[in-house]
Amino acid sequence: MNTGLDLEYSFNEILKGFGLSSEIAHIIWLPLPMLIVLVSAVVGVLVTVWLERKISAAAQQRIGPEYAGALGVLQPIADGLKLLVKEDIIPAKADSILFTTGPILVLVPVILSWLIVPFGQNLLISNVGIGIFLWIALSSIQPIGLLMSGYASNNKYSLLGGLRAAAQSISYEIPLALSVLAVVLMTNSLSTIDIVNQQSGAGILSWNIWRQPVGFIIFWICALAECERLPFDLPEAEEELVAGYQTEYAGMKFALFYLGSYINLILSALLVSILYLGGWGFPIPVEIIAKVLNLPINAPVIQVFTASIGIIMTVLKAYLLVFIAILLRWTTPRVRIDQLLDLGWKFLLPISLANLLLTAGLKLALPQFFGG
């Protein structure tokens, strides 16, 4: 297994060069991964919120935000500051402990999942070797927070929203996991680094989307349902449930739901990029680029190009999927709850299971194409 660059070891070696002991260097390192993840996630949310506002405005033939900074780029910051200073209200008959714990359980697992996302060649905070398994385990915690929030609010609309969120998540978690298992089966690894490296042979032709088109579609549909994006926003349908499980929330507790939703959307887009679109891989193999430039593959220029373009490609692929998700919000009608559950249990689940069995058969029959 390619472990990639050990960021902790490199950081400790740099601090040792300044005369610090390994124990002190380790203590300084401990909060840094989460700090890096938090900063990356918050910046990603700010960009996504601005994109959603501008794309939504364009879809409705409006201008969108334009006064808060150039082209309204400061509007997401203004939204965050507004929520920060709003009063934090707990309903009179609500369970205050569960009411407060719910938003935390929604946000924390999503942020922790970012630890296993490689943003570029050898650029990964924690390559635990079972990154995909860890992400599936963490994603199963979020519905508990949603159900807890709906139950603790002492509001019928909130409770219905929480129940819908739990039912929706359970229905789509299984086909989501089965579609990922097909990719894991071809790679023989649960590491996100190994999954991307397995797609790096022939540029765009090596990407898993060609070998797993059905899995790609199932994963994207399930990811949208897990993120509660239209047409799957049943838990917070404004016309039916006011705001669903968020109805009684205000201030920073509401902001945690808001933040968690967008962080989950970006995370899902990044995982689609890693699992099916080659991650940091450039559509043209680096060997061809080096040959055109008449440079050896290990030349410093090629190494710098590979590292730089890797981060750019990962982010570009992810935001292309975010763009598609935003467009779907304004171009598709909301499904009913019975239609949503039927889609998950009667269609996606058997298709994803059949796709996994087909992948196993093709792996035995054509090991050179499906990971022998």
Curated annotation (Swiss-Prot):
Name the source's superkingdom.
Answer: Bacteria
Q: Which Pfam families match?
A: NADHdh (PF00146)
Top EC class per UniProt?
A: translocase
**Membrane topology summary:** Multi-pass membrane protein
Q: GO annotations under biological process?
A: aerobic respiration; photosynthesis, light reaction
What name goes with this protein? NAD(P)H-quinone oxidoreductase subunit 1
Record's subcellular location: Cellular thylakoid membrane
Q: Which organism is it from?
A: Prochlorococcus marinus (strain MIT 9515)
